[in-house]
Regions:
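Helix-start (N-cap) detector for alpha-helical repeat units in TPR-like alpha-solenoids
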Residues: 69, 103-104, 154-155, 189-190, ...
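Canonical tetratricopeptide repeat
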Residues: 74, 108, 159, 194, ...
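Terminal, low-structured helical/coil segments at or just beyond the last alpha-helical repeat
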Residues: 60, 201-240
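Structural signature of tandem alpha-helical TPR/SEL1-like repeats
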Residues: 48-55, 82-91, 118-144, 168-180, ...
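N-terminal leader/linker segments that initiate helical-solenoid repeat arrays
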Residues: 19-78, 82
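Canonical positions in the second alpha-helix
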Residues: 61, 95, 145-146, 180-181, ...
Length: 240
């Protein structure tokens, strides 16, 4: 515990020195040498000892940075649980600076951006929905990045499908992602409903009807079955 505290204290001192005008890199290096007890090694043993100490310093800093990234992710999920989507979005963005290849973080960015689009009002009365649209495009980009990292990531596939169908009004784009999600999680009723809607909105009525039939066959809930039957009737009426 004391070692961890010392790591963060050392980092804080280094950042403070860098932020002060007129402080050179030589000053920072001199402080580091004092901390490690290394000055100007010349012999083989002194050089080996200096290398070992600085390797340990690098490992300590990497450990500290890794932990900071994890804490930002946890902070983001806490904000998300409390429906503080703007703060959650900021925390996940910070976490991505430490873990830029983490598909879960991109997924959470997509979720938060989607929620923030609902709160994006035209406060300047400009007559445009630019802020809302920007959040929606951020959500799209985040989901796509998550899928690029893990192409079988069902939650991201589903989230992107919902975005295309209900927010961006691009149901044709949703279909391949939702179909892939269904091929992985074959009994996910939520995905089935969104895919059926995507087919309907794309005028693929036969596929929409077939998907509602699949929901009716799969579900054990009377309410879910009733909803699927009602939606199926709407599609049948539209197909004639």
């Amino acid at each position: 515990m004391n070692k961890i505290k010392w790591i963060f204290l050392t980092l804080a001192i280094s950042f403070a020195l860098v932020s002060c005008g007129g402080v050179s890199n030589k000053t920072i290096i001199r402080h580091q040498k004092m901390e490690e007890g290394v000055d100007s090694p010349t012999s083989i043993e002194e050089l080996k000892d200096a290398i070992k100490k600085y390797q340990e310093r690098v490992a300590d800093v990497q450990l500290a940075q890794s932990q900071i990234g994890i804490w930002y992710k946890i902070l983001g999920t806490r904000y998300l649980d409390n429906k503080m989507y703007g703060e959650a979005l900021k925390a996940f963005q910070e976490a991505l600076t430490y873990y830029p290849d983490n598909q879960n973080l991109y997924y959470y960015v997509g979720v938060c951006a989607g929620y923030m689009s609902h709160a994006a009002l035209d406060y300047n009365a400009s007559g445009t929905n630019e802020v809302k649209y920007n959040y929606l495009k951020l959500a799209e980009e985040a989901y796509l990045r998550a899928i690029a990292i893990e192409d079988r990531y069902v939650r991201a596939l589903y989230g992107l499908g919902v975005l295309y169908v209900f927010e961006l009004d691009e149901p044709e784009k949703a279909i391949p992602y939702l179909e892939k999600a269904i091929s992985i999680d074959t009994k996910n009723l939520d995905t089935m409903f969104v895919l059926a809607r995507a087919y309907y909105s794309s005028y693929e009525f036969d596929k929409s009807i077939a998907m509602y039939d699949k929901i009716i066959e799969t579900t054990k809930s009377d309410d879910t079955k009733k909803t699927a039957e009602e939606n199926k009737k709407i599609v049948l009426d539209a197909s004639y």
